[in-house]
């Protein structure tokens, strides 16, 4: 089986399409902050897609934004499917991707450690 399977290709196209639709803006006032669609995973039967999103905002705002995205999922899946000309519209599910926040935290901790070392602290 190829690493470039149809579900993987469709998931990547869906990710790009979803990012475009979100970038154009949603009317839901809960959707604020900088949103990045970091990945997408399509089920083998192409009936469900999980979109991984990173939201650069404070915790409360991030939760509201994720709620807004989930509330808009039917609209978003329809818009993306229309742009991709898919025969069937996959059910869209959002998951918050913590990897970016974790990476930022690790980078901050490393920077603090380097600063302590440069000042001779232990």
From Swiss-Prot:
Monomer. Binds 30S ribosomal subunits, but not 50S ribosomal subunits or 70S ribosomes. It holds the Pfam family RBFA. GO terms for cellular component: cytosol. It is found in: Cytoplasm. One of several proteins that assist in the late maturation steps of the functional core of the 30S ribosomal subunit. Associates with free 30S ribosomal subunits (but not with 30S subunits that are part of 70S ribosomes or polysomes). Required for efficient processing of 16S rRNA. May interact with the 5'-terminal helix region of 16S rRNA. Keywords: Cytoplasm, Ribosome biogenesis. Belongs to the RbfA family. GO terms for molecular function: ribosomal small subunit binding. The gene is rbfA. This is Ribosome-binding factor A. One of its GO terms (biological process) is maturation of SSU-rRNA. It comes from the Bacteria. Its main location: cytoplasm. InterPro entries: KH_dom-like_a/b, RbfA, RbfA_dom_sf, Ribosome-bd_factorA_CS.
């Amino acid at each position: 089986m190829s690493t470039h399977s149809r579900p993987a290709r469709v998931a990547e196209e869906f990710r790009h399409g979803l990012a475009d639709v979100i970038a154009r803006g949603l009317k839901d006032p809960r959707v604020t902050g900088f949103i990045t669609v970091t990945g997408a995973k399509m089920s083998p039967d192409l009936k469900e897609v999980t979109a991984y999103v990173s939201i650069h905002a404070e915790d409360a705002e991030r939760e509201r934004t994720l709620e807004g995205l989930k509330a808009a999922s039917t609209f978003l899946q329809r818009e993306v499917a229309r742009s991709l000309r898919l025969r069937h519209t996959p059910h869209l599910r959002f998951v918050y991707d913590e990897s970016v926040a974790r990476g930022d935290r690790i980078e901050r901790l490393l920077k603090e450690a380097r600063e302590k070392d440069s000042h001779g602290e232990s």
